[in-house]
Amino acid sequence: MEDIYKLIDDINLQKLDHLDTRVNEALTSNNDDALFILGETLYNFGLTPQGLEVFRTLYHKYPDESELLIYFIEGLMSENQTDEALEYLNQVELSPEKLMLEADLYQQINMTEVAIDKLTEARELEPNDPIIHFALAELLYFDGQYLRATREYEVVLDTGEYEINGINLFSRMADCALQSGNYSDAIQLFDEISEDEMISDDFFKKAIAYEKNDLTQEAIKIMTTLLSKDPDFIQGYFYLQSLYENEKNYPDAIETGKEGLRLNQFYKELMVSTGSLEIEHGDANEGVELLKKALEVDNAYHEPLLILSDLFRQEEDYEAIISLLSYVDRKSVV
């Protein structure tokens, strides 16, 4: 008989020869504790088909064990065996665990409203379980039901938890407020998060909330902090540039664009915005070159073509207009 613990050690060492055969041998063992560890190990290493068979065997032995049901159903869902997962769940007595698994399953097959209904039912069975409230809040959040999501996040916060699975609840609630147009509430909620706990998206969204409240200078400070902490947050350069432009601070707007382009030479939208600013408020020749580079990156990108065409027409530079034809993607104009 296969030594299960030796098999577990070999999996940890990535010694996977004859794995299917060895797992099948292990399934004949009566050491269920070792089999459970084997199933977990297989899942942890992404060996889901083999892990699924381990948990199938254990679940058939102990059908009343909710933990085994969870592992088994999650394995079926990972293998896209949703019909079989539903069949098993239909045979299980009503419980919060069953309803949460059904919610996961329906979410996986894009039946979000059914998933929300399942979690709502689970919440009624266990009204004080913060995990159920959080799971429901997350579904509502990603479904764009921000006010309902906020109420669920608030319930979790009332338990003393402000972070679950690495997700900051103040961040989620702040984004809900932002997406709902409650910009003052969004600022207050973002301000509850210390900078050390904020991720790049938090800084970005916080800046948007300040801008929406006509606090553009504060938004600029937030974006400057973000880019100093995470210079690879490339879309931040485009947004910070627009903030400077709104304040008519064209030199800083142009420099921000150039800084972003030094990090990503193929960011065509930033090429166009920076090029346009150069033409209007800086070095027009540099601006023209940036717009041409945008066309080299994507010759089906019409915006730089239109800007250059208008510019050359105003200057009556007909040779330059003709030269633009070399950038035209003929397939896009047929």
Where are these regions (language model features)?
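Register position in tetratricopeptide repeats
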Residues: 12, 44, 78, 108, ...
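TPR-repeat structural position
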Residues: 13-17, 48, 82, 112, ...
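Canonical positions in the second alpha-helix
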Residues: 25-26, 57-58, 88-92, 121-122, ...
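Helix-start (N-cap) detector for alpha-helical repeat units in TPR-like alpha-solenoids
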Residues: 31-34, 66-67, 96-100, 130-131, ...
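Canonical tetratricopeptide repeat
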Residues: 37, 71, 101-104, 135, ...
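Conserved small/polar residues in nucleotide/adenosyl-binding loops
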Residues: 332-334
